[in-house]
Amino acid sequence: MIIITGHGNFASGLKSSLDLIVGNYDFIKVVDFTENKNPEELKNDIKSIIDKYSDNELYIFTDLAGGTPFKVSSELALNNNVKVFCGTNLPMLIEASMMVSLGCDIDTNFIKETGINAINPKKKVVEFKEEGI
């Protein structure tokens, strides 16, 4: 089971992109931390998913280390079978969702490396020339 959470519509935005690339999986849940939600509501929303799927390995992917979604998720992970990632990007979620879809546990080190490798700057830069008006 994968839970994606973050500030604003970070989670639902990533899920939308993920669905286009790998398909819509039932084992991926999203919890957005929007401006009309307080930290306790966020915690309750995430906890309800954890409680419902407590028999499964659970992985929570968050946006920022130290942010409210990360802190709430980390707190909930202490008493549950949950692993928490921060700094989530789309390549991490693609790999994680493929692992779960194949019935594998998520290789946390591989997911971390995938996230890091996805942000490497490219050596070749494409230059655009402005056409005259």
Positions of PLM-derived features:
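N-terminal loops that bind phosphate or other acidic moieties
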Residues: 1-61, 65-133
